Amino acid sequence: MCLMFTMFYTQMRRVLVEREIKNLQTTFDQAVDDVNTELALHQSMSDYLAFDQTIVQIVKAEDKNSFEAYERMVKEFDPMMDSLSYFYPEIRQSTVYVRDFVIPHGTYLRPAREMENDEWTAPADNDVHWYADMDQGTVTLVRSMPLIDDGKGGFLYISMDYSKIFGSMELAVNEDYGVFVYNEDKEVLYENQKMTRNAKYQMEFSDFQKIQKKEKQNTANYILLEKEIE
């Protein structure tokens, strides 16, 4: 009887663990999909701005000091940029940086030399580049604007609230858990650890990497789940 009970208990425990892993995987996959959706949404918005004819015409206007140029800036450019914060409240700053001569206009239109020491000053392609800064609490999108001198004359900079982009990583689970988001260079872009009952299991990213190398799924104390943010 004791042997039968042990076998039954072991099998039941295995079934429960497998069910818990499946539930966690579903929750985790949904959280990552939500981040991917956020990134895709903002990338689509940047596509619209990067190829917008109004911005190009204002930036490339021959007489930037004319009243007509200023009027168009106020009546067309400003409302368009203002609308970004209305439709995307997570946006902290949206700026078009131009390498040619430009009359600065608030935070919306600035000379590129102001950013010349930053890594995103000169994207060499038309791809969208993402940067995350845990200390500043920002996620930044940077891309060249192809219609401004073949992409060499200006670029679009959009800074967003870090917590809004990665908000779905606050997993809706009762168990203690931790989340790391890292890039190809193994740099941590986001970290969230909720070890409320078992603080001893909280780990540094280097500890996670050691466990990750040993086993992809189950360890004695952890369940490891992974999914790529596209």
Q: Residue ranges of each PLM-predicted region?
A:
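Solvent-exposed, extracytoplasmic
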Residues: V74-Y88, D149-T196
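Extracytoplasmic/periplasmic sensor domains and loops in membrane signaling proteins
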Residues: E68-M81, P104-D135, E175-D176, E191-N221
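Extreme N-terminal signal-anchor transmembrane helix of membrane signaling/transducer proteins, especially
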Residues: M1-R14, E18, K22
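N-terminal sensory and localization modules of signal-transduction and trafficking proteins
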Residues: V15, R19-N23, D127-W130, E184
